């Protein structure tokens, strides 16, 4: 199984097939706080204030633009929920791919280094 460090070194790339449910569960064990929510992997990040939340969203925008793999974001005053899903896999039916986990790992690294989510 791939480690978070190995995911950080990878770059998103075109894929045709989604991961199997077993593969998804294996990847979820590598990333802290991410969970399967319907057809997405998702994680909620909390911040001290609106400014930190929006700074985090802007930093995410840079990462996902570079990776060419864009999440759905739910943004509130002090919270951002990030959801990944790959629309292009399974002949356009969609699913979860390694690209979702690559980007999730990069967002976790960003949050851990610069935006440290508040503990509950």
Swiss-Prot record:
Taxonomic superkingdom: Bacteria
EC numbers on record: 4.2.1.96
Gene Ontology biological process: tetrahydrobiopterin biosynthetic process
GO molecular function: 4-alpha-hydroxytetrahydrobiopterin dehydratase activity
Keywords: Lyase
Signal peptide: none
Coiled-coil regions listed in the entry: none
Keyword Transcription regulation belongs to the record: no
Keyword Calcium: no
EC class (word): lyase
Pfam families for this protein: Pterin_4a (PF01329)
Reaction(s) this enzyme catalyzes, per UniProt: (4aS,6R)-4a-hydroxy-L-erythro-5,6,7,8-tetrahydrobiopterin = (6R)-L-erythro-6,7-dihydrobiopterin + H2O
Classification via PANTHER family: PTERIN-4-ALPHA-CARBINOLAMINE DEHYDRATASE
Family: Belongs to the pterin-4-alpha-carbinolamine dehydratase family.
Full protein name: Putative pterin-4-alpha-carbinolamine dehydratase
Record organism: Bdellovibrio bacteriovorus (strain ATCC 15356 / DSM 50701 / NCIMB 9529 / HD100)
């Amino acid at each position: 199984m791939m480690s978070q460090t190995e995911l950080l070194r990878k770059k998103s790339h075109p894929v045709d097939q989604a991961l199997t449910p077993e593969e998804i569960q294996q990847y979820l064990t590598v990333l802290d706080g991410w969970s399967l929510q319907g057809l997405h992997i998702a994680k909620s990040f909390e911040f001290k204030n609106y400014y930190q939340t929006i700074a985090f969203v802007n930093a995410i925008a840079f990462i996902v633009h570079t990776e060419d793999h864009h999440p759905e974001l739910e943004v509130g005053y002090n919270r951002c929920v990030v959801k990944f899903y790959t629309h292009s896999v399974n002949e356009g039916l969609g699913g979860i791919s390694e690209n979702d986990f690559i980007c999730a790992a990069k967002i976790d690294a960003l949050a851990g280094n610069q935006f440290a989510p508040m503990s509950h």
